[in-house]
């Protein structure tokens, strides 16, 4: 028990000691704060006394200055005004509003001026000047200062009373179009207008389904008409060789001629060493010689010269033509686009360059860029049909000719580059029509025309596919076909001989759209329409090249 009591008294003593230590720390902090506040108060009191002393000095200076200035303001009333001499009066004219007050000078007044330097508030000086009615200790006026910056614009004034109406002015320019107003009421229907011109002929529609089989008709009467002989057909293939004929009678005895050198001897090479039992080799040699120098072979084109541009127009497709038969006729005809009904007729080449023309109206719409002019007549394809029209200038009634088994619709063109189904060509041998067969849909055919009867004399199948052709022309009875890019002549066909001829030469360098290509025998030039450029190409024949050698 005694030990427990001692332990309790020891714990109580330690608690009292901790409390006393905390109270001592708080007292020390309080004393330190009090000392700090007293120091700050003393500093602030000293600063306040200094400010009050400075303010007292300023007030005393202000009161002294006010008393001095008041004394100065009362001094001019007691001093008599001295008489002014003319020079003094002239010097004192400094105001336009009146004569200014005389200046106080030390020489004429029994006064002593004392100048002191002190700091005077600006507000005090302003109040002094206002109270003395303009009498200030200022010097003479200085020069006028620069003009100040422009002020802000003032407020708009109120509208004035409307004036009298003036005279009517001149009519002004037409103003801008105003906003569209509300739609008006529906008016009464107008009178029926005149019937317009017919539009361009469209392409034929697709073939319809076959109709139902009709009833059997009545038996017809027996005809006594004599059937006319049809046109001459194509030449058939050569037949097989026939049997040898009987031996002929012996010939008359002749003197033996000289033996040709190097013939049938041991030194001759190749097939010439074989001794023939007939004249086969001799005949073949003669045929080759005749073919090499035949007039038709010499009519071939060897080359095409550099082109010359005649005119540039806007239309990509078109045709320009000159008379082929009559050399004295200088007229030029132009059709624009690959479909239309109007033809421009120019008097001559200068009229073409100056765009001076006469407009001709055709009886039927044309289609394509394969027209031709021959003996004062225009030959062209009637759009939407397999008909060729011959329109003689100066007459109203045209002539027509139908070509059976020819493609003329569904954009199955003969030449896709020029959108042409039929190409009419005129050369030294007559009038030709180049077209595509509808039987196989690919071969190029040529029909020869009889100008007098305007009928077909023969059809020639070249067997050349139109898919490989870009354009074509006929010169001296030979058909020439270009490639699909119209840069080279890759095929030739002898229309009179009915056989293909080897031909492969350059035509042009450009790859523009070749809408029209035609040979004119009048000047032996190729006429072309290339993307709006009207061009001329000189032609070189084999006969001319041989004569130059």
Swiss-Prot record:
Membrane topology: Single-pass type II membrane protein
Main location: membrane
The keyword Secreted appears for this protein: yes
GO cellular component, one term: extracellular space
One of the Pfam families matching this protein, by short name: OLF
Topological domain spans for side Cytoplasmic: 1-17
Extracellular side: 39-549
Membrane-spanning segments: 18-38
Site residues by UniProt (Cleavage): 94-95, 277-278
Residue ranges occupied by any Olfactomedin-like domain in the UniProt entry: 296-543
Matches recorded under InterPro entries: Collagen, Olfac-like_dom, Olfactomedin-like_domain
Biased composition (Basic and acidic residues): 213-222
GO biological process: clustering of voltage-gated sodium channels; microvillus organization
Keywords on record: Cell membrane, Cell projection, Collagen, Developmental protein, Differentiation, Extracellular matrix, Glycoprotein, Membrane, Neurogenesis, Repeat, Secreted, Signal-anchor, Transmembrane, Transmembrane helix
SMART domains: OLF
Reported phenotype of the disruption mutant: Mutant mice present no obvious neurological phenotype and have normal nerve conduction. Nerves from their peripheral nervous system have myelin sheets that are indistinguishable from wild-type. In contrast, they present impaired and disorganized attachment of Schwann cell microvilli to the axolemma at nodes of Ranvier. Mature nodes are formed by the fusion of two heminodes. During development, mutant mice present defective clustering of sodium channels at heminodes, but display normal sodium channel clustering at mature nodes.
Record note on modification: N-glycosylated. Proteolytic processing by a furin-like protease causes shedding of the ectodomain. Further cleavage by BMP1 releases the olfactomedin-like domain.
Matches recorded under PROSITE patterns: OLF
GO molecular function: protein binding involved in heterotypic cell-cell adhesion
Description of how the protein assembles with itself and partners: Homotrimer (via collagen-like domains). Interacts with NRCAM and NFASC/neurofascin. Interaction with glial NRCAM enhances interaction with axonal NFASC. Interacts with MYOC.
UniProt function note: Ligand for NRCAM and NFASC/neurofascin that plays a role in the formation and maintenance of the nodes of Ranvier on myelinated axons. Mediates interaction between Schwann cell microvilli and axons via its interactions with NRCAM and NFASC. Nodes of Ranvier contain clustered sodium channels that are crucial for the saltatory propagation of action potentials along myelinated axons. During development, nodes of Ranvier are formed by the fusion of two heminodes.
Entry text on domains: The olfactomedin-like domain mediates NFASC/neurofascin and NRCAM binding.
Protein name in the entry: Gliomedin
